[in-house]
Amino acid sequence: MAVYQYAEQFTQFLAQKYEKELCSDALMHSNPQITFLNAQTIKLPRLTLSGYKDHTRTAGFNAGTISNDWEPKKLAHDRDIEFFVDPMDIDETNLALSVANIQNVFETEQAIPEKDCYNFSKLHTGLTNFHGSIDSTTVLTAQNILTVFDEEMSKMDDAGVPVDGRILYVTPTVNKLLKAADGIQRMITVNSSNAVNRNVHSLDDVTIKMVQSGRMKTKYNFTDGCVAAADADQINFILVHPSCVVARDKYAYISLFTPGTDSRTADGYLYQNRNYWDLFLIERKVAGCAMHVTKH
């Protein structure tokens, strides 16, 4: 009878898988200096300083003012699941591989898509609450897509959002518009096998990441897995700099209880998985995120 802690054994595998398959992975690593205040709360520093004053060339300097406080954010997305596995369905001599297969399928079909759905919808919630830039009136076409993009880029430039590191998340439909956009210049490459690559990987040094449209809704129902809410709107693109976001995985737990470990396992295996995380848009950096949304 044993309990295997697979979260430790599969740490590298999961990290590589998430980096490859989680579209919003870059947002999960932003602002590493922000720490947890307690088990459920992270604290966002808010530092305000006064500006220069005229120097009088007499002894002493002008006194400035400094204000330092914290904006607490409580993590709320705490998810878990368990599966009972009959011993006839698992080869005990290859236990790790069997659990890895369960984990791989669950992460691919459930956990990773849900994390993207939650993260992108949470960005929309933050933009709505902080009155950020959400365009829900312009109909995107190949003729105006670059103009809409340039307008959002200009707003960020004017607000002092860093140029380096901006990411443009787009649905396949918007990605298709970018390929056909009026005024866009591309270098078309032909490799040794005569395959033609027409992909647009960046725009004005902004990295483009294509995301399934099902993962870019404004609202989801998380009662049983993750499904788009009936009144959800479609997010078409998100232009964001990761510095305006704080996202944290607080707790990850993956265990397998062997037969007879406790009364629930009986003669079978019990697989448990828990993930506790959240994402927050920083109010003072709301200019670092913009969206285009189509109403349902």
Where are these regions (language model features)?
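Sequence/fold signature of self-assembling virion shell proteins
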Residues: 2-28, 35-51, 71-76, 82, ...
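Phosphate-binding glycine-rich loops and adjacent basic patches that engage nucleotide phosphates
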Residues: 3-8, 63-73, 104-117
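Structured, hydrophobic secondary-structure cores that serve as assembly/anchoring elements
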Residues: 13, 43, 49, 62-64, ...
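Catalytic micro-motifs at enzyme active sites that drive phosphoryl/nucleotidyl and oxygen chemistry
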Residues: 30-32, 156
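Glycine-rich loop at the start of a catalytic domain that most often binds anionic cofactors/ligands
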Residues: 57-61
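Alpha-helical scaffold segments that mediate packing/assembly in large oligomeric complexes
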Residues: 90-159, 172, 291-296
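Internal, well-folded beta-alpha domain core
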Residues: 122-139, 150, 154-155, 159-182, ...
